[in-house]
Amino acid sequence: MIYIRKLSILFGLVFGLIVITFSNIVAEQQESNAEIADKGKLITEIYGCVDCHTPKIKEGEFLVNDPDRLFSGHPGDNKLPQFPPEIIGPEKWRGLFTDSMTAWGGPWGISYSANLTPDKKTGIGKLSEKNFVSILNIGIHSNMNRKLMEPMPWKEISELKDDDLKAVYQYLKTVKPVKNKVPESVPLHNHENLAQIQD
């Protein structure tokens, strides 16, 4: 009877140690994930991702990022901006952007900042970490039909280490999902259709 009780105590101690060890591993992992997301946030700030992918609101005399629409891209419910045809096309090295700083026109065509929130229908919610990193490595849009367009500095971003891009992905998964379907960008090779698209 004493022998069985000793075994029970020993088993309890071993089980307790396993639980404590596992809890510590989980806590360290959670802390590590938080640190990775913090690193990703810092990278998005350094590269100005939040400024180009967040619509602006007026605050006094200044345009500031709308905190309710962080990383949600060009507002899909806005009327498409009118860009003068003289800035679109080869050798026309001028550009314009809208007040929201989420729509851009220039020699590359017309581009709209993407929705980078984790919304599953209109953002990157269904995009895997692997695909996210691949898109930024090779500069191909997620629909695989075209390259990422200016002024997105994807060539500079592609030089980041994969771990840095993974950190950005982990951070973006923590921001508030915003349902916002961004208009399709129009590459230069489609510039003959721009007038129709802007009507």
Regions found by a protein language model. Give the residues of each.
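Electrostatic cytochrome c docking/interface patches
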Residues: 27-45, 57-62, 81-82, 122
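Stable alpha-helical elements in mature extracytoplasmic
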Residues: 36, 48, 112, 128, ...
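Bacterial N-terminal signal peptides that target proteins for export
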Residues: 2-12
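Mid-length scaffold segments of soluble, non-membrane domains
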Residues: 109-115, 119-126
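The canonical Cys-X-X-Cys-His
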Residues: 40, 46-56, 132, 168, ...
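Flexible coil segments in periplasmic/lumen-exposed cytochrome c-class electron-transfer proteins
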Residues: 32, 54-112, 141-199
